Amino acid sequence: MESSTSSSGSALGAVDPQLQHFIEVETQKQRFQQLVHQMTELCWEKCMDKPGPKLDSRAEACFVNCVERFIDTSQFILNRLEQTQKSKPVFSESLSD
């Protein structure tokens, strides 16, 4: 009975890293979408005084600056996540069995 428990435990161990990786990726996507929403709201509140038919030069410059900072920040975050992903081998447990 113990051998069947240990073999099913090792089978689950082989699936867990894949599932964990999938969950991490989906969580990162969700966080990124939340960040886009927050930055859109922040830039709108910061830069848009009165909605009108045309942006004035101050509002336009503000939006450009806000979006550029968002892109810089997003690129930094993506690079950091990529470094984190590379430093964690996904299938290391299944290869050692």
Curated annotation (Swiss-Prot):
A motif (Twin CX3C motif) lies at residues 43-66. One of its GO terms (molecular function) is zinc ion binding. It is a peripheral membrane protein. The modification Phosphoserine is found at S57, S87, S94, S96. The keyword Transport applies. InterPro entries: Tim10-like, Tim10-like_dom_sf. GO terms for cellular component: mitochondrial inner membrane; mitochondrion. The keyword Membrane applies. Its main location: mitochondrion. One of its GO terms (biological process) is protein transport. Mitochondrial intermembrane chaperone that participates in the import and insertion of some multi-pass transmembrane proteins into the mitochondrial inner membrane. Also required for the transfer of beta-barrel precursors from the TOM complex to the sorting and assembly machinery (SAM complex) of the outer membrane. Acts as a chaperone-like protein that protects the hydrophobic precursors from aggregation and guide them through the mitochondrial intermembrane space. Belongs to the small Tim family. The twin CX3C motif contains 4 conserved Cys residues that form 2 disulfide bonds in the mitochondrial intermembrane space. However, during the transit of TIMM8A from cytoplasm into mitochondrion, the Cys residues probably coordinate zinc, thereby preventing folding and allowing its transfer across mitochondrial outer membrane. This is Mitochondrial import inner membrane translocase subunit Tim8 A. The lineage of its organism: Eukaryota, Metazoa, Chordata, Craniata, Vertebrata. The gene is Timm8a1.
